[in-house]
């Protein structure tokens, strides 16, 4: 029996139990990730958070009005759950896709099914080109990305960047869930900026949200999320390239942990940024 998400995936016993106890999973999720103090994750939205969510809705709606076709590249992380909820509830004109690299965690595929049950909608999945992927694996091996930065970037290009470029073709703007708090590179971003490498505008409506606010929103709205977050995975990507972090580590320390911090991006977040109304260059990832 096929999973419905991912290439020829067979559900595990854990997946079957989760599917049978959907209501019980909300009890598990209510605990939240261990790196977020429980006392700040209230059961209702605060006035401040309601205002921030309203600002996100306005930013997204303005993006549709100004740029026409807008698409959200859904990472399926915690921030993605906030944006998915807001888009599907308030700005349905925005399309949503996610990239299935073929190396995602089982919990990520389970999350896709939970979201479909909750919202009665399905996120469009895009995949790497099969010929390019076969060539890549033939050249560097199944896990060749561990051997050098160049090999890892080549893997990310085939599995993520190229499918991403196909998915955003024809759109006037794309939406991302990056936040300043996540890394020094992302701290330089602007809410709306021209994405020169991809030839369209980029909208980052959560840029000034804190992680605590992200989880306050998720808990108050009872939104499904990736259960890896409860195991100290604040940032989740491909299974081989993601690990849990230790207390006190940077939020993205679990991504490509064998590399230097300044290189820990996949290429979807270029570091050449041109904000609307201004421009500045800070390098290229």
Question: What kind of feature is each model-predicted range?
Answer:
Residues 37-285:
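Nucleotide-activated chemistry modules centered on ATP-dependent adenylation/adenylyltransferase
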Residues 19-23, 36-38:
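Intrinsically disordered, low-complexity terminal segments enriched in Ser/Thr
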Residues 19-21, 30, 281:
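Ala/Thr-enriched low-complexity intrinsically disordered regions
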Residues 7-11, 24, 278, 284-285:
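Intrinsically disordered, low-complexity segments enriched in Ser/Pro/Gly/Ala and basic residues
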Residues 1-3, 10-13, 26, 33:
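Short, low-complexity intrinsically disordered segments enriched in A/P/G/S/L with frequent Arg
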Residues 4, 30, 41-44:
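Absolute N-terminal positional cue centered near the fourth residue
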């Amino acid at each position: 029996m096929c999973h419905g998400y991912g290439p020829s995936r067979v559900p595990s016993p854990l997946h079957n139990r989760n599917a049978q106890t959907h209501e019980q999973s909300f009890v598990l999720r209510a605990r939240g990730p261990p790196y977020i103090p429980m006392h700040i994750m209230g059961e209702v939205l605060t006035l401040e958070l309601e205002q921030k969510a309203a600002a996100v809705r306005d930013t997204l709606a303005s993006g549709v009005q100004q740029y026409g076709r807008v698409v959200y590249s859904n990472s399926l992380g915690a921030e993605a759950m906030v944006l998915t909820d807001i888009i599907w509830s308030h700005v349905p004109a925005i399309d949503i896709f996610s990239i299935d690299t073929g190396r995602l965690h089982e919990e990520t595929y389970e999350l896709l099914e939970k979201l479909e049950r909750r919202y009665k909608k399905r996120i469009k999945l895009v995949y790497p080109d099969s010929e390019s992927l076969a060539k890549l694996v033939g050249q560097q091996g199944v896990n060749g990305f561990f051997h050098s930065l160049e090999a890892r970037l080549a893997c990310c290009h085939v599995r993520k960047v190229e499918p991403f470029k196909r998915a955003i073709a024809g759109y006037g703007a794309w939406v991302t869930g990056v936040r300043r708090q996540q890394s020094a590179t992302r701290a330089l971003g602007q809410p709306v900026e021209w994405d020169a490498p991809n030839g369209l505008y980029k909208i980052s409506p959560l840029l000034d949200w804190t992680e605590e606010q992200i989880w306050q929103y998720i808990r108050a709205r009872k939104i499904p999320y990736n259960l890896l977050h409860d195991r100290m995975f604040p940032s989740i990507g491909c299974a081989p390239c993601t690990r849990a972090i230790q207390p006190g580590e940077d939020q993205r320390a679990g991504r490509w942990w064998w590399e230097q911090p300044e290189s820990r991006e996949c290429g979807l977040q270029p570091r050449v940024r041109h904000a609307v109304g201004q421009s500045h260059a800070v390098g290229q990832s």
